[in-house]
């Protein structure tokens, strides 16, 4: 009996998700959370009742090796599923598990779409999550609540897999809200720190704005197409009166979840969470959810060039803003955070020029080297007693050779060095941009941002491999832990091989014609960036910049000052004035008691003015009244 490859792929994929969902409940038997502040920001979900441990004491159970083994097994199964799919030419599989409300006009069902996007993301996501989970066992070992860390971590990955596999708006919304809620829990893991609590709340608020866009899209899609199936919504193009609002909802949703310009401040602030959370958040889960949604629905944009232009300019602006801000930062986690925002902008710009496949290609390659960068940072920060200032990490390569080598490799991949993961996807995006007839401004912004990426990436390498040693001799530096080394080496292999493997066996490069000059554009951009950083490092060491442009980039284009301070203060004052004018001086004064008193006084004064005691005015008014009455009577009788 011959087994259909599609059956094997679908069985493996659904089994992986089912095993992950069930095994998460065994990732931790410790539900004790340390005392938290009594406020909404530091709210935590407690599972003491589920653990049958009313005293909240930590149970003597270590779930780290079990969680790592589960993720390792599932990662290997996902790779097998991916290889079978490659041999089967990535035939899309649409699974419908059950139908709800069959007697209703709207087709509400649970659908999964196992296509090229999901099957590749399944492998990439599980490999990256496995590596980060293994690193977490080393990093969170001293945390008093570290045993409970693996459960929300696993739930985070599961919700992202639900989001990427779902073909039903119901499941899309479930996964979308799941990663949002769990990001709040993980960012505020150290909730006794005010910065962590406020950062988690900031992430929720900005993502709520994006959720408005997704709900708008879902509502109008169901209203116009009478279906919850995403494929049917895209195939049966909605009514033209609503499609523009649907596209606006998609753009707003992607901007909120993927931290595009205007809704970006939450992403750098999320660095207050544990480093494994930052690694998972920035590499293969929440921040790429918005981009993935645009990739899934990119066909809706094909007939609306203005919408594509908005997406392109938004992505280019985000990439330029984040890259220009990163070059002026000294907090190494903030530098990598802004680099994530810049790369997300590049992905969105790729969708804007009509290349969603290239955007997804960059999602997959970016996941490996960005996760590796964060794990390297976590190792360095952990060894330097939570020191995050890049200028105080000079000479770290002599003390941590493996970590420094992986950090340099990740930075080189980020800047697009040939034959590393980032080169293959960024090269194709820049070539496609130069060959497209899309908005020139958006393309130019993306190219300049790519050049600046080289600047801040090489800046990290320069300080880490500097001959000067600014590290405290008391820092407990060491690389003896196998969980750290194995995770870094695994991701480094992905950084080296993933771009080549994906470009040759997974993705079919888009067909477009470029001139030799345009073909050399990516390499030229990298060379220009290296030239800029060399000149800057040689000149700025003795001539520090004190200019408006430097202040602008250091202060994030004054965005936070304007939006969080000026606009907030202005809106508060105007709303206070309006409410005071409407309520205190409105209903309660002008229209209320004082208004009645003023009206009565005015009527009384008018009545008094008419009764001044002059006989001639009384006689004149009587004659006028008699004349008017007589005239009207004559007119009526005649």
UniProtKB/Swiss-Prot annotation:
Keywords: Electron transport, Membrane, Mitochondrion, Mitochondrion inner membrane, NAD, Respiratory chain, Translocase, Transmembrane, Transmembrane helix, Transport, Ubiquinone
Catalytic activity: a ubiquinone + NADH + 5 H(+)(in) = a ubiquinol + NAD(+) + 4 H(+)(out)
Location of the protein in the cell: Mitochondrion inner membrane
Alphabetized InterPro entries for the sequence: NADH_DH_su5_C (IPR010934), NADHpl_OxRdtase_5_subgr (IPR018393), ND/Mrp_TM (IPR001750), NU5C-like (IPR003945), Proton_antipo_N (IPR001516)
Segments traversing the membrane: 7-27, 66-86, 112-132, 169-189, 203-223, 242-262, 275-295, 307-327, 335-354, 365-385, 404-424, 445-465, 487-507, 520-540, 618-638
One GO BP annotation of this record: electron transport coupled proton transport
Full protein name: NADH-ubiquinone oxidoreductase chain 5
Gene of this entry: ND5
